[in-house]
Amino acid sequence: MRPQKLILSAFGPFAEETVIDFTRFKDGIFLISGETGAGKTTIFDGICFALYGEPSGSYRKQDMLRSDFAKDETETKVVFLFSHRKKQYKIERNPSYMRKSKRGDKMTRQSPYAVLYQEDEIVTTGSQQVTAQMEEILGMDRMQYQQISMIAQGEFLKLLYAKGKERSEIFRKIFGTWYLYEFQEKIKRRHLSCKYEYLVRAGR
């Protein structure tokens, strides 16, 4: 998957519509830097939220995504354009949040919603439906995507302080080497089985 453009509106610290054009970075590698609280992690939250309906960190929930600085009339949403296997996709998604009613000053809850486009054609609509479709397109769920594609700022501490066995499991998930581990365990079981069979026959 290659990100092309991310549009954040009233999302996290971004009170107004903010556009990040990834196509400007031609070298393939670029650095996202800034002071604490500037919104670096929010960029990853926006991408992960667009794809799977949840932000990148386990400590942030949908109802925490609306910017505290946004005007009442500003819609909270994320638009993410990307390419995958030579196909162009666009996702528009909004979280559940409290907004001002269109009639009067009462506050009402905006329901989560999403639309997935492929080459300007609607593929599916609905928050859960888009998430399910993205899991099928990318071949991984949100947890697998996070472990392979990004380690959020807070989640990185889990890796630093993980014990030996737990750290090994994290790295297996990150680098996709579970199949090697399972193959190794299969060989061990086969070895023990052959060894037992040999000892039984030798005892006879």
Listing of model-derived features with the role each one plays in the protein:
Residues 30-31, 49, 122, 136, ...:
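Extended, Lys/Glu-rich alpha-helical coiled-coil stalks
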Residues 1-132, 142-144:
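Extreme N-terminal "head/tail" segments of very large remodeling/mechanoenzyme assemblies
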